Amino acid sequence: MKTEAQSYWGGIIKSMGLVFGDIGTSPIYTLTVIMTLTKPDAEHVLGILSLIVWTLIILVTVEYAWLAMSLGRKGEGGTIVLKEILIRLLKSGRQMAFAGFLAFLGVSLLLGDGVITPAISILSAVEGMRLIPGLEDLAQGGLILVAAVIAVFLFIFQFKGTDKVASAFGPIMVVWFSALTVSGLVSIIGTPTVVQAISPHHAVLFLKHNGLAGFFVLSEVILCATGGEALYADMGHLGRKPIIRAWYFVFCALVINYLGQGAFILRNPEAKNILFSMVKSQVPMLYIPFLLLTISATIIASQALISGVFSIVYQGITTRILPLMKVDYTSTHLKSQIYIGSVNWSLLVAVIFIMILFQRSENLAAAYGLAVTGTMFITGIMMTMIFSRTTKKWKVPIALAVTVIDFAYLTANLHKLPHGGYWSLVLASIPLAIMVIWTRGQRALYRSLKPLDLDTFLLSYEQIYAKGHNIPGTGLFFVRETPVVPPYVIHCIIRSNIIYERNVFVSLTRTDEPFDVRTKLTRGIGTGLDAFEVNAGYMERLDIEKLLKKHGVEEKVIFYGIEDIDTSNPVWRIFATIKRQSANFVQFNKLPVSKLQGVVTRVEM
């Protein structure tokens, strides 16, 4: 048995490996990028450090650790969970549509971010190779090649599942945060005046004295908080308490390191790659091990983000906002460990494309930030709407204040649009377009299918069944909901007289709870006709065959519908293409191939 202390520290260490990789690797590039925009004098450095500290307090600690993490569904968090909570509290259809669109936008921005984060993290770490003696003149193309090779190995590795190596992520990140803390402390001791930056008046003075230019610096300051949304999104994997406990340690490590980097800038105003230069000046002998540790930390950060993308896509599939895709479960005991091949390879291609396109990490910083601030702003709006409709109304002014600050950061980021920022919108527009076309297409398709109500269907069914030419055994027919009979079933049973001694309509409904499975077998809805209903949470992994066997249903054949869409509408043509390319219901639920019979129905849309 684990002692309480072991599970307490175990939870913290695990959180560091799975949640804090992204925000934990921000010190590699944040101040390096900001200092290209401002003078390295005491007034500017203290102002920027103060902005960084208070950004971490307001946008990560208050918005995510305190406000967002108080809103969970059975321990699950994230944009889709916020949408499910909010929709339950809304009454008008317009408000529901608005909440749905906000969720679509939030998910799309997060997925777009899933391309930029691995690219900037790995590239910025690899750029530290230039400080190794003899490699000072290493061409940028060589660095991109090294970064691309690391990315390729990282994405190929996904198929095996990260279960076995995930246990090493936590300890490596503990070493990383310890190194950041020690390095920062050593530097602060040399110039202790930087500690003044903890006072917010330095941030206010910086914004006041620098006007519009100071406001635009916020677009780079936000880099220190990228990955803050992971606290809430990954809540389902590890639980609220271990993540919040780990955040206190991570927060201290980050603040100490940023202050240390600030102290180093004051002593070395000409320094370029600040974190690497600081560590090299402190312990030149340990620079190469530190560089390897940095690369390991960025790989772990990218890994956590890839797992997060898989998780978001899976939630999107099961809540029907994304098309079905083939999902592999890579862990026998961790529900959250999944692999989606199509998403994995698309991400890899996009990451390498972005690396080649932007060349340097400071160029990539121009595209970074817009998606993050957009996600934070959307989270702020949704939280404010939720708190205003619950008993926690006292949190509304706080959530509103945070949302206004989010909006200020988002506005500051808009000036990045012409300098590469538009790429984060291009990347986000792809999943957004898929979600909008898919959800609207599904609704339009359902209307075009013209299903039959059960009572009308039973009139013909009973006559055919009574003739007695029934096939021995049990036939399963997948339907969307039991009282409604889809055209393919009418085609099979009524027109083709394919009728078994026992026929079972199977329907699967995903509930708005993350975890929960309820089954119900209704016998005798017609002669030799039963209905089997499964209500499952949207994060549940289902073994439908096992559930059927539990209720004594041993099928001989499984029928399912395939829609062949005929349309001249260009949008519905895109929908038809997505539908053809995506996995069908039976592939997604891993039903036995030898028993499957797909029945094609031609549908005009």
Curated annotation (Swiss-Prot):
The keyword Membrane applies. It is a multi-pass membrane protein. GO terms for molecular function: potassium ion transmembrane transporter activity; symporter activity. The chain crosses the membrane at residues 17-37, 45-65, 96-116, 139-159, 169-189, 211-231, 246-266, 286-306, 338-358, 367-387, 394-414, 417-437. It catalyses: K(+)(in) + H(+)(in) = K(+)(out) + H(+)(out). It comes from the Bacteria. Keywords: Cell inner membrane, Cell membrane, Ion transport, Membrane, Potassium, Potassium transport, Symport, Transmembrane, Transmembrane helix, Transport. It is found in: Cell inner membrane. One of its GO terms (biological process) is potassium ion transport. GO terms for cellular component: membrane; plasma membrane. Transport of potassium into the cell. Likely operates as a K(+):H(+) symporter. Belongs to the HAK/KUP transporter (TC 2.A.72) family. This is Probable potassium transport system protein Kup 2. It comes from Geobacter sulfurreducens (strain ATCC 51573 / DSM 12127 / PCA).
